Amino acid sequence: MQREVYVSITGLRVRRIWHIPSFWSLATKAMVQARSAPGNISAETRTIDGVHHTRSVWTDKAAMQAYLTTGPHLEAMRRYPTIAKGKTVGFLTTEVPDWAQVHAIWVEMGRDV
């Protein structure tokens, strides 16, 4: 049996074209933070149908939550409502979804944030 990991999937759409520079500045800093955060196994991005997605894999939910509430990601969450809209979903699994699955899971199970 494989080890269980926590997968977090986000999908965000920038509200207005003039928000793009702020969005990418915040997103880039948050991704750098994620990739070096304790408990992070992987963190990747893709744009699918104009939606900016992330898929991050963590040793456990606590590691993801520690990242979520500190540093650049916390700043991004504070600014998020004014520059973007989207959905997130997180779950425990023994199989990390591929990108086709990521998008389907996000569409089906994502909750508005």
List each language-model region with its residue ranges.
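Short S/T/G/P-rich N-terminal loop/turn motif that feeds into the first structured element of a domain
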Residues: M1-V51, Q65-A66, K87-V113
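An amphipathic, aromatic/His-enriched active-site/gating alpha helix that lines ligand/cofactor pockets
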Residues: T59-G90
